[in-house]
Swiss-Prot record:
It comes from Drosophila melanogaster. This is Phenoloxidase 2. It catalyses: 2 L-dopa + O2 = 2 L-dopaquinone + 2 H2O; L-tyrosine + O2 = L-dopaquinone + H2O. One of its GO terms (molecular function) is metal ion binding. Disulfide bonds join C581-C623, C583-C630.
């Protein structure tokens, strides 16, 4: 019986042959000769004996008849792989099916070992990751962080070269971390570059990659895609990214991001990633300023789409929103109601295989990524691959990602603006009132938050192929804040014990011109900081909650988890949950950067009636940690209200400011976020 943990070794050193040593314990797969590629079959004994001296563990691989891999092998090993391309999606779907349909872990190991040296390394990583997440007999395996396996997606090529040099020349115990420069993609002449720390943050890009891994939009096994409220989660997670990005823009004296409304306008911003793909051995193509989109006709990618197609799909989606229903493939009306409308729209706009009618409403969001990522070579005349917008692990580095998603969010907001506003009765919690709220950092002034820079080291050795083994560290600079605590004083006058759902949001107080924000603008800038259940005793209550407990974020250790060092004990419920926990907003980016003189924000806290919000289900283990943006593994989303409640709809009539929106179970307080331009080293 194969040990399922050995499957994780197949992620190590993705471009090396499968029979090379892997893992911290020097482990080798005993690959049957018939599984080797033509290049290595004649010399396998020689190579394996060379590796064999140091081996601590051997993994037997059973020889079985291999399913038809022609479709997965149709993508070259040195091509770029993108989930946004329909051809690549079909190829990935086929490989996922093959991995999912293997009867046992033994058979899965055999097929994975056979496929590993024959299919594209990034495709292999994606398909095996999805299969391990969804197969009942492999759930609970901790997938290695994508940044460790493919460091080239996160680090510029100069640093990669220095890391190669370090690992080749210096013995493992003496190696020094290689510092990633802070300003390597542009200079301050480009105002957009002020946001480098957000767009190029390793944790944020890993969150986006991991979210799409947990919520794939295509697979022939529908259950892999059809998770609870995944369309709504697509809307909400990306809406929150835009709200957070806009708060960062205010923290750098920039206006809110403008949506990419007219697809025929030039894209003002250029982007030069300065990264090389180790799989394709090519540089990621840049996009020059004022590039226009063109119709795509790339035979090699089986792509033939016109800008007119995107415009038609957009118009049909708007028409459906204004009519209040969409037409499914059988001609039936599917209502866009308060309960499920946003979920239907999310699957339709993204689009996933759950879309009610892909023929009519198309594939707007995914194709937008494709159009932008091929803007530099729309007909494949220069044989160039896609830019960073074509890959979920790199897309958030590009300023145009936020313009495109603001445009997508505007379509969702059109639907939300047509729903009836929440009434005071829907918002109020009779008998429960908040007396006061305060935020404190250790030893700081009340209601003042502080951010600064921090340098952290991440081990990238799994992704460095054809080099001596041992740790290779990259040191990167990221935003960090002093931890803080919310203190909420509230009264329960109902005379009995009650349960409340505490919802914490924050938004800038003033707009770009320094004017107090109107409620209808401010609601779309609200970033969710936390959401948790609390019991309310009769009479006065004081609730304290630490910022590190947030339902939005995961701790640093989990974003960059070292799978060997801090793995929970084998077989425990905690271990089962460890992997899903890779999805979540990085805790170091919980609050915006702020300004040296302080960014004026308003903190909003609401306690809603948990009886109305509760979902009856068991949540074992710790993986509801980042449920707000990621949901909970194999469970329903743990909140009955719409995502973003109470700010997901326009306010009731007569409410033009946040203060008029409040009911007794809500409270606001002004908070100041100061940025100190100092850099501290993260304690190891």
């Amino acid at each position: 019986m194969a040990d399922k943990k050995n499957l994780l070794l197949l992620f190590d050193h993705p471009t090396e042959p499968v029979f090379m040593d892997k893992g911290k314990r020097v482990t080798v797969f005993d690959v049957p000769d018939s599984f080797l590629t033509d290049r290595y079959r004649p010399i396998s004994n020689e190579v394996q004996s060379r590796v064999g001296d140091k081996v601590e563990q051997r993994v037997p691989v059973r020889e079985i008849s291999i399913p038809d891999l022609r479709i997965p092998m149709s993508l070259g090993r040195d091509e770029q792989f993108s989930l946004f391309l329909p051809k690549h999606r079909r190829i990935a779907g086929r490989l996922i099916d093959i991995f999912m349909n293997m009867r046992s872990v033994d058979d899965l190991q055999s097929v994975a070992v056979y496929a590993r040296d024959r299919v594209n390394p990034v495709l292999f990583n994606y398909a095996l990751s999805v299969a391990l997440l969804h197969r009942p007999d492999t759930q609970g395996l901790d997938l290695p962080s994508f940044s460790q396996t493919f460091p080239d997606r996160f680090i510029d090529s100069q640093v990669i070269r220095k890391m190669r040099e370090e690992s080749f020349v210096v013995q493992p115990g003496s190696r020094m971390p290689i510092t990633i420069p802070r300003d390597y993609t542009a200079s301050d002449l480009d105002p957009e570059h002020r946001l480098w720390y957000f767009r190029e943050d390793l944790g944020i890009n890993l969150h986006h990659w991991h979210w799409h891994l947990v919520y794939p939009f295509e697979a022939s096994d529908r259950s892999i895609v059809a998770k609870d409220r995944r369309g709504e989660l697509f809307y909400y997670m990306h809406q929150q990214v835009i709200a957070r990005y806009n708060a960062e823009r205010f923290s750098n004296n920039l206006a809110r991001v403008l949506p990419f409304n007219n697809l025929r306008d030039p894209i003002a911003e250029g982007y030069f990633p300065k990264m090389d793909s180790l799989v394709a051995s090519r540089a990621w193509p840049p996009r020059f300023e004022s590039t226009r989109l063109s119709d795509l006709n790339r035979e090699s990618d089986q792509l033939n789409v016109e800008i007119g197609d995107l415009e038609r799909w957009r118009d049909r989606i708007y028409e459906a929103i204004h009519q209040g229903f969409v037409m499914d493939e059988r001609g039936n009306r599917v209502p866009l109601d308060e309960a499920t409308g946003i979920d239907t729209l999310g699957n339709m706009i993204e689009s996933s295989i759950l879309s009610p009618n892909r023929v009519l409403y198309g594939d707007l969001h995914n194709n937008g990524h494709t159009f932008i990522s091929y803007a530099h070579d729309p007909t494949s005349k220069h044989l160039e691959s896609f830019g960073v917008m074509g890959d979920v692990s790199t897309a958030m580095r590009d300023p145009v990602f936020y313009k495109w998603h603001s445009y997508i969010d505007r379509i969702f907001q059109e639907h939300k603006s047509r729903l009836p506003a929440y009434t005071e009765n829907q918002l109020n919690y009779p008998g429960v009132s908040i007396a006061g709220i305060q935020v404190d950092t250790n030893g700081g002034r009340p209601n003042n938050l502080t951010t600064f820079w921090q340098q952290s080291d991440v081990d990238m050795s799994r992704g460095f192929d054809f080099l001596p083994r041992g740790n290779v560290f990259a040191r990167f600079t990221h935003l960090q804040h002093l931890p803080f605590t919310y203190t909420i004083s509230l009264n329960n006058d109902s005379g009995a014990q009650r349960f409340g759902y505490v919802r914490i949001f924050m938004a800038p107080k003033n707009d770009e011109r320094g004017q107090p924000m109107l409620m209808r603008d401010q609601r779309s800038m609200m970033i969710e900081l936390d959401k948790f259940v609390t019991s309310l005793n009769p009479g006065p209550n004081t609730i304290r909650r630490r910022s590190t407990e947030s339902s939005v974020t995961i701790p640093f250790e989990r974003t960059f988890r070292n799978l060997d060092a801090n793995r929970p004990a084998a077989g425990t419920p905690e271990e089962l949950e460890f992997n899903f926990c890779g999805c979540g907003w990085p805790n170091h980016m919980l609050v915006p950067k702020g300004l040296p003189e302080g960014l004026q924000c308003v903190l909003f806290i609401m306690v809603s009636n948990y009886e109305n919000d509760r979902i009856d289900q068991q949540l074992v283990g710790r993986c509801s940690d980042a449920a707000s943006y990621c949901g909970v593994r194999d469970r329903l989303y743990p909140d009955r209200q719409s995502m973003g409640f109470p700010f997901d709809r326009l306010p009731r009539s007569g409410v033009d400011r946040l203060v008029n929106f409040l009911t007794p179970n809500m409270s606001i307080v002004d908070v100041n976020i100061r940025h100190e331009n100092r850099t501290v080293q993260r304690p190891n």
